[in-house]
Amino acid sequence: MWFLILFLALSLGGIDAAPPVQSRIVGGFNCEKNSQPWHVAVYRYNKYICGGVLLDRNWVLTAAHCHVSQYNVWLGKTKLFQREPSAQHRMVSKSFPHPDYNMSLLIIHNPEPEDDESNDLMLLRLSEPADITDAVKPIALPTEEPKLGSTCLVSGWGSITPTKFQTPDDLQCVSIKLLPNEVCVKNHNQKVTDVMLCAGEMGGGKDTCKGDSGGPLICDGVLHGITAWGPIPCGKPNTPGVYTKLIKFTNWIKDTMAKNP
């Protein structure tokens, strides 16, 4: 959520050094083409705002703090600012933020210690199904708890530098470690709850950042989280990022999808 607040502040402040986006990968590398076929670029009109994850042909999962009045998505992209034959564009017919997410946090404000970013996820219903190809494939929800110490991969088009807002064209990937939540509790002022995951590199330098919100956290090959919030500047030592823990929400996700075919 801090990523979105900073993104909005930069946009409203007239920053023109880079196209406006939300959060981004620091310390990463260009993802191999088609290696993240579930990764979705979420737009408000023609402005990229967040990442997302394709769960099936009709549904995208993203962060609730990415909530805006209108959405459309691009699937199968590896380059944000270029046309690609593999890419598919879809409108979003309806959005479903988690009912327990505190939407008042969307008002721009300085993060406070009492802020609780729990339940930060949202489903987007596509107006027409995605075509499944080598570049566009869904990923399954988790069926068990993630293992501490797992190697996790995060991806996104968020800022590639921790302080100066700089967006990449190529989809970025970075490997980080799944850490005990106590590490994030100790090193963040905001609440870290049992519906969140703590992941990063304690030495710093590798992190999600401004523009990565809603993108996938894949640990040992399994989708376990989506990017939620983290430190500013991104990639600070001893301050891992915080992710929504999807195993806590699989029933809500499945029920919402089933009730809105």
Swiss-Prot record:
EC number assigned by the record: 3.4.21.35
Keywords: Disulfide bond, Glycoprotein, Hydrolase, Protease, Serine protease, Signal, Zymogen
Propeptide: 19-24
Signal peptide (residue range): 1-18
Annotated glycan sites: 102
Top-level EC class: hydrolase
Reaction(s) catalysed (UniProt annotation): Preferential cleavage of Arg-|-Xaa bonds in small molecule substrates. Highly selective action to release kallidin (lysyl-bradykinin) from kininogen involves hydrolysis of Met-|-Xaa or Leu-|-Xaa
Domain of life, per lineage: Eukaryota
Family matches, as CDD domains: Tryp_SPc
Annotated transmembrane regions: none
Peptidase S1 domain residues: 25-258
Covalent S-S links between cysteines: 31-173, 50-66, 152-219, 184-198, 209-234
InterPro entries named in the record: Peptidase_S1_PA, Peptidase_S1_PA_chymotrypsin, Peptidase_S1A, Trypsin_dom, TRYPSIN_HIS, TRYPSIN_SER
GO biological process, one term: proteolysis
Family: Belongs to the peptidase S1 family. Kallikrein subfamily.
Function description: Glandular kallikreins cleave Met-Lys and Arg-Ser bonds in kininogen to release Lys-bradykinin.
Descriptive protein name: Kallikrein 1-related peptidase b11
Source species: Mus musculus (Mouse)
Organismal lineage: Eukaryota, Metazoa, Chordata, Craniata, Vertebrata
